[in-house]
Amino acid sequence: MDKKETHLIGHLEELRRRIIVTLAAFFLFLITAFLFVQDIYDWLIRDLDGKLAVLGPSEILWVYMMLSGICAIAASIPVAAYQLWRFVAPALTKTERKVTLMYIPGLFALFLAGISFGYFVLFPIVLSFLTHLSSGHFETMFTADRYFRFMVNLSLPFGFLFEMPLVVMFLTRLGILNPYRLAKARKLSYFLLIVVSILITPPDFISDFLVMIPLLVLFEVSVTLSAFVYKKRMREETAAAA
């Protein structure tokens, strides 16, 4: 076995170890969340007038596992980000390592901010609008599975989408992206974000519109922040070359 193959095996072993640590953290958070899942459930349905219905015993377990899984994913993000950083850190320069480490806490904060926006802002508005449509015409009954799927579909994607500005800033700082590339890709980006907004919302124009606007705003914020970071990086490179 030559030196190159030994080096590759070492990298794969390190990657395997980082993945195992991340998965172990996820399952630990999953078990912890499941122990408190009834309290989480009660908190999430605190504003409902009645109880949610279930169509079978297995649906109860499915709902509890879904709620526990979402909590575990949220709690595992800092662990996954840190393990990824530890894996790529040896290949980075001292400046790149410093920049990368600075962005990890921000990823978790923006993920929570995105979920909070989806849950506290979008979800009540869309739910109220849709239930208002049935007022006086239909007997509304929510099943636990449908209710929480609807909640997750509106909230969880925003957890990841809210990270877009920070990811763009990070890639701009490393020289992979710049505001000019983002501006050229604006039409394509708008199209993709509109498709995402349609996929994660119920099939009505109001819901699509309410989700579409924040996504487009996030993209424009990303372009603006990219321009700020790009100018700062250019000034630093000019000063270093002088």
Curated annotation (Swiss-Prot):
Chain's role: Part of the twin-arginine translocation (Tat) system that transports large folded proteins containing a characteristic twin-arginine motif in their signal peptide across membranes. Required for PhoD secretion. TatCd promotes membrane localization of TatAd via domain specific interactions. TatCd is required for stabile production of TatAd as well as for its maintenance.
Listed PROSITE patterns: TATC
Chief place of localization: membrane
Ranges for region Interaction with TatAd: 128-149, 171-187
HAMAP family associated with the record: TatC
Membrane protein topology class: Multi-pass membrane protein
Signal listed as a keyword: no
Subcellular location: Cell membrane
UniProt family annotation: Belongs to the TatC family.
Induction: Expressed under conditions of phosphate starvation.
Knockout-associated phenotype: Depletion of TatCd results in a drastic reduction of TatAd.
Gene Ontology CC terms, in alphabetical order: TAT protein transport complex
Additional observations: B.subtilis possesses two minimal, substrate-specific, Tat translocases: TatAd-TatCd and TatAy-TatCy, each one composed of a TatA and a TatC protein. TatA is bifunctional and performs the function of both the TatA and TatB proteins of Gram-negative organisms.
Protein name: Sec-independent protein translocase protein TatCd
PANTHER family with a match to the protein in the record: SEC-INDEPENDENT PROTEIN TRANSLOCASE PROTEIN TATC (PTHR30371), SEC-INDEPENDENT PROTEIN TRANSLOCASE PROTEIN TATCD (PTHR30371:SF4)
